[in-house]
Amino acid sequence: PQMMNTMAPRVDPAGPGSLTEAFYADPVRRYMIPVFSDRRTDWASHPQATRDSLHEHDMWVAEGLTHRYPTKVLAELLPTCPQYCGHCTRMDLVGNSTPVIDKLKFVGKPADRLGDMLDYLRRTPQVRDVVVSGGDVANMPWPRLEAFLDQLLDIENIRDIRLATKALMGLPQHWLQDDVVEGVGRVAAKARARGVSLAIHTHVNHAESVTPLVAEAAKAMLEAGVRDVRNQGVLMRGVNDTSVDLLDLCFALQDNAMITPYYFYMCDMIPFSEHWRLSLQEAQELQHAILGYLPGFATPRIVCDVPFVGKRWVHQEDSYDRVRGMSFWRKNYRTSIEAEDVDALSREYVYYDPIYTLPADGQAWWREQGDALAAHDAAIARATASREASALALG
């Protein structure tokens, strides 16, 4: 109901079908209640799209614990959410299997999985930052979540804890329950006594979703003692793909709910998401367009989550082939699966633009590629050769 009530909220009936038309055009509807006609018929999915596009499962060091960055881990406590988004980057884990898709499932018992996560963190002192997610932590009974957080706070090397919950926007009533507010207060007090930063990260994509109840829930969390409530939105066509949309959302978050605009992620390369995705060039232009309107601490960074690399500001690409829609990225650290990979820090990693955004010759090139893996390898070779030629010319 929280989401439904924000769809086409101020449309006056103007004859038969007018409300239906407004409902279909609504930006919140476009990503929360997708219909088949939303999808593109030319490129419904990118040839490089995968169900675990960030390879988080490959980097599990314990079941559900992804060690992707040098000092930070992602703890996926459970595979369910109060609401399911079509653009979910963890679509391969979150939600139930269907007759068509057999999803990844946790094997271990919840208590055993959480215990294994804590054991890994105790014996891995370089980890200081834990994103506690899922799914959505709001779907975990509060006593179990508090018990996990309490044990997490007993680990000396942990200095930052972030609770990831879209439910702060989609089901704010959860975070207003007395037992939850009181429990957050206890966890926040322990974190403060230990000098640990405790924050909540939510996921709001449009200004219409910042309702009075969302604002009440966010303020309740701040009053309970969390250091900050931050927003990590996703950049999506037809939802928030203009500077006006983004600024309206940021002002609503700041002014109405005391939520800090933090990141906007480019939509990940998962199947059937092309109608939402923007090109890197479009993201760069949007980042430029929103600068100067907000305080520096509340100016969100638009980031590209590059497979095997991690999130990078959209202007950090190493090179960019705009005809074929391929941006090339490097990194300065190894993931948990690359300890023996001598080329990890010199390798080129690729992010792909939606093919329909490319010029005609770029789209034609992709139509000729029968082998997606070969196209990927060819792109890497082409970029490498171009840089080597430039180096020789400068040399």
Q: Whereabouts are the PLM-identified features?
A:
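Flexible, acidic/Gly-rich N-terminal and inter-domain linker regions that tether
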Residues: 1-68
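Auxiliary Fe-S-binding modules of radical SAM enzymes
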Residues: 1-20, 24, 247-395
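Generic hydrophobic, aliphatic-rich segments that mediate packing or membrane embedding
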Residues: 3, 24, 69, 73, ...
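Short regulatory "switch" loops immediately downstream of catalytic or recognition motifs
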Residues: 3-13, 92-100, 186-188
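Hydrophobic/aromatic-lined pockets within catalytic cores
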Residues: 8, 12, 86, 93, ...
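A short mid-domain helix/strand-loop element embedded in enzyme catalytic domains
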Residues: 50-64, 82-96, 115, 120-125
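Canonical Radical SAM [4Fe-4S] cluster-binding loop centered on the CxxxCxxC motif
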Residues: 67-108, 163
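Conserved AdoMet/S-adenosylmethionine-binding subsite of the radical SAM
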Residues: 111-125, 129, 135-294
